[in-house]
Amino acid sequence: MKKILITFFTVLFCLTSSVGWSLTKDDLVRRDDLYYKKFSDIQFTGKITGQFQGSFKNGKEDGSWIGYHKTGQLFYKWKYKDWLEDGSWVSYWMNGQLQYKGNYKNGKKEGSWVDYNKDGTIKRELTGTFKNDEKISD
């Protein structure tokens, strides 16, 4: 009987330790511009999976992010650094065509930004210095 119990608990331990808990953005709540795990007062640090995939550090979005439309089609790829937009930002229409692409640095648009129509043709292209998402100089 003792061997059976030891075997049972060993198998149970192995099974439960190999199951990982994955969180989605639905498992988080946003308060005061920070993200928390539901029913917690501790700012969330970790990765989420699902329709939106990325990392949080001390309640702030950090690192590379990928999002998908509900159809499974790629929606966006972008990056954060200390919760500010930083690096390449690309978004796609539900039909797979580019919607826009550009770069951010320290939360501000920088360089060239291109907006596309749903058929893939260029809607507008902006290059220069931006303020409040509007171009103010070359």
Name each model feature, range by range.
Residues 4-16:
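Sec-dependent N-terminal signal peptides
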